[in-house]
Amino acid sequence: MLAHATLLRPTPLSARARVPARRVASSRRASARAAASAASRPAIVVLPGLGNCTEDYDDFAAELESRGFHATVARVIRPDWLRNAAGLADINYWRGTLEPRPTVDWYLGRIADAVAEAKAASGDDRVTLVAHSAGGWMARVYLNDYGVDDVRALVSLGSPLNAVPKGVPGVVDQTRGILTYVEANCATPAQLGIPVTCLAGRWLEGRESVEGVRDAAGFLVGQGYKQVCGDAAAWGDGITPVATAHLDGADNVTLEGVFHTPLGSSDDRPWYGTPAVLDRWVEKLRVA
């Protein structure tokens, strides 16, 4: 773009006259080829999960780039998540009826910035949102309030997308009502009118009790599952139960043996963005 802008800078007539026509034509062809090349690389915007930062997704973004996509990760640093503490000042937090806005307005702004950046850098007119963990429900809020004109598809990775069940003993809604609001007020996949794919990992089954050392991990994970879906014996990716990561009306996919997060992932504990796992769902990103 800078080189093209230089060509448009006012120049004395005599200097313009010395530029051969074939050079101008060649420059135009090169610009057209560059634009076509950019447009042929679909733009992906990766949305970090709760507690994560942009750099956590460097390897994932590089893998997407190697497969022909233009990847942009929304700019988030870990201290940004402290902004969510603003919700504590809202009486609805304590009532369990908290709404996502204005508490997560800062994150919605980061999505908007990343979408604009991706479009400008790739030459693509729309992007696919790939939302990890809590980024999934925040993507739903974004699409509901900002619209879908700039977005061609949404893919969520282990995102909690359903309201926490009420009336289950020992269960406290960790979102303080936000997921209930999202479920009741945000557009469904059918209403959005764009492809929505929800990926869930089936890495570890939770346990309701500890019957031995081998059950300890399942018990600890199960207590987390219970706070999200009401069932400690559910299957999930270690953080999000399968049932919570799937959304009515979406293309719901369960990935066997997949862990929740890039932090702590390995060949033995692959997450959604591990190359071998990405092989299993990358076609969901190739939408018209």
Regions found by a protein language model. Give the residues of each.
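Short aromatic-enriched loop/helix-cap "lid" or pocket-rim segments at secondary-structure transitions
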Residues: 58, 83-88, 165-170, 207-213
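Serine-dependent carboxylesterase/thioesterase catalytic core
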Residues: 48, 65, 71, 97-99, ...
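Short, surface-exposed "cap/lid" segments of acyl-processing enzymes
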Residues: 39-83
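Short, solvent-exposed loop/turn segments at secondary-structure junctions
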Residues: 50-52, 78-79, 136, 160-162, ...
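Proteolytic processing junctions in secreted/extracellular precursors
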Residues: 3, 30-38
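C-terminal catalytic-base region of ester-bond hydrolases, centering on the histidine
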Residues: 193-288
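N-terminal chloroplast transit peptides
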Residues: 1-23
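Glycine-rich "HGGG/HGxG" loop immediately N-terminal to the catalytic nucleophile
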Residues: 77-94, 140, 165
